[in-house]
């Protein structure tokens, strides 16, 4: 499912194994992108002994030849492949890659988990947006956790939108109330894009 931390988990694995981390999205990446990554991975391994983790999001969007291209480099250790898909991998990923892989199914996050992330995003000054001096009502936090449907990114995007697009009250704070939360997760995202490039996706790093 979306928003369950697939990308972040891959980054954690790369960090804990002291590996280089490369990320591509199969919906837009072509063979040239993969060739460049393989070359860089070979150089890093040969010159510095540094392994490379290649994270391919939406790997089911690669066709058979694209998946086959990666196979020899997975086999010889040039790259460690982590693929993410919202589809059934047994139908969408080549058997040759599957036979060399372990499959982990990530479940949608529980409502309480998302609620905790929402509160952390609002109040944590180091890892969240606590420096903005915002607060969120209990019913708003519950609402976001409920309608996110297991997708933490959706809830966190709404939090960021609420903080950045809601006017401060007389007390100098931004109050994320239930109406604000409902508007942010449904319609305000369409109107707000700070740099024309999905600015509000940044808070998804919490996942």
Where are these regions (language model features)?
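Short glycine-rich substrate-engagement loop in P-loop NTPases that contacts/grips substrate
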Residues: 21-53, 63-64
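C-terminal helical "lid" of AAA+/P-loop NTPase domains
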Residues: 142-147, 153-168, 203-207
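Conserved catalytic/switch belt of AAA+ P-loop NTPases
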Residues: 56, 60-89, 95-99
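Short conserved motifs of the RecA-like P-loop NTPase core
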Residues: 51, 129-147, 179-181, 202
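Walker A/P-loop
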Residues: 1-24, 39-42, 71-72, 76
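Conserved C-terminal helix/linker of AAA+ ATPases
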Residues: 159, 165-188
């Amino acid at each position: 499912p979306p928003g369950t931390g697939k990308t972040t988990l891959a980054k954690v694995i790369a960090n804990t194994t002291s590996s280089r981390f490369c990320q591509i999205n199969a919906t837009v990446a072509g063979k040239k992108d993969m060739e460049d990554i393989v070359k860089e991975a070979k150089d890093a391994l040969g010159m510095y002994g540094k392994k490379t983790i290649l994270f391919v999001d939406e790997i089911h969007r690669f066709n058979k030849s694209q998946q086959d291209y990666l196979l020899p480099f997975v086999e010889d250790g040039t790259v460690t492949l982590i693929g993410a898909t919202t589809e059934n991998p047994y139908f969408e990923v080549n058997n040759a890659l599957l036979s060399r892989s372990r499959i982990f199914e990530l479940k949608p996050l529980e409502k309480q988990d998302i609620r905790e992330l929402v509160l952390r995003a609002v109040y944590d000054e180091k890892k969240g947006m606590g420096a903005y001096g915002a607060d969120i009502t209990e019913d708003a936090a519950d609402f976001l956790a409920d309608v996110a449907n297991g997708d933490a990114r959706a809830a966190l995007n709404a939090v960021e939108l609420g903080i950045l697009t809601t006017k401060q009250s007389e007390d100098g704070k931004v109050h994320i109330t239930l109406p604000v939360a409902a508007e942010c997760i449904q319609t305000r995202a369409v109107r707000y894009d700070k740099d024309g490039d999905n600015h509000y996706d940044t808070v998804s790093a919490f996942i």
